[in-house]
């Protein structure tokens, strides 16, 4: 069963096929994908495939991805979750994205806190990592503000649009 999480303003729930249009609306926007590590979507089928990948990865316990939805208005505004989930090593990487209309309103921070807490307390993680492009100032600051520590730079770690990119490596460990 997929866990539903709630904060003061948000419901985090399973991403479902009906979310495809909303996901496509922001992943087809270069402002979102330029810091995300994936090419910009060009058709709705790309979003449908991504949703299927989320479901497959969850069923195989390799990843979990929540839809971020505001309590005061239905409709996905972004997603957040864990990738590279290792039960043996009790760790995962967290990733997130939000539609630009909802940037700088504290939603990502709110979701990040409850998902991190869930990872430590319910999934048994002792380490949660995050990789962020150095030029993505907002995301770098978000992680630092929420208790993640910068560990260093991974050179040529990600490829996007056929170009290598360095990333900042962050982590938060269970104390």
Which sequence ranges carry the predicted segments?
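A generic secondary-structure signal
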Residues: 53-57, 118
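Short loop/turn motifs at secondary-structure junctions and domain boundaries
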Residues: 57-61, 148
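A generic membrane alpha-helix/interface feature
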Residues: 46-49, 55, 99, 165
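A generic local structural motif
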Residues: 52-54, 156-157
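Acyl-donor (CoA/ACP) binding surface of acyl/acetyltransferases
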Residues: 1-33, 65, 69-175
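Conserved GNAT-fold acetyl-CoA-binding loop/helix
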Residues: 33-53, 64
């Amino acid at each position: 069963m997929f866990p539903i999480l709630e904060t003061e303003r948000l419901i985090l729930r399973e991403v479902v096929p009906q979310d495809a249009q909303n996901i496509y609306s922001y992943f087809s926007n270069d402002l979102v994908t330029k810091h995300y590590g994936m090419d910009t979507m060009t058709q709705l089928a790309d979003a449908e495939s991504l949703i299927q990948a989320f479901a497959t990865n969850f069923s195989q316990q390799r990843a979990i991805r929540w839809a971020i939805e505001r309590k005061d208005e239905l409709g996905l505004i972004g997603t957040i979750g864990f990738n590279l989930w290792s039960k043996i090593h009790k760790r995962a990487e967290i990733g997130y994205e939000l539609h630009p209309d909802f940037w700088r309103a504290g939603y990502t921070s709110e979701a990040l806190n409850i998902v991190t807490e869930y990872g430590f307390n319910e999934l048994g993680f002792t380490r949660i990592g995050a990789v962020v492009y150095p030029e993505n100032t907002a995301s770098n600051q978000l992680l630092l503000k929420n208790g993640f520590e910068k560990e260093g730079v991974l050179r040529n770690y990600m490829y996007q649009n056929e170009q290598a990119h360095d990333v900042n490596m962050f982590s938060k460990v269970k104390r």
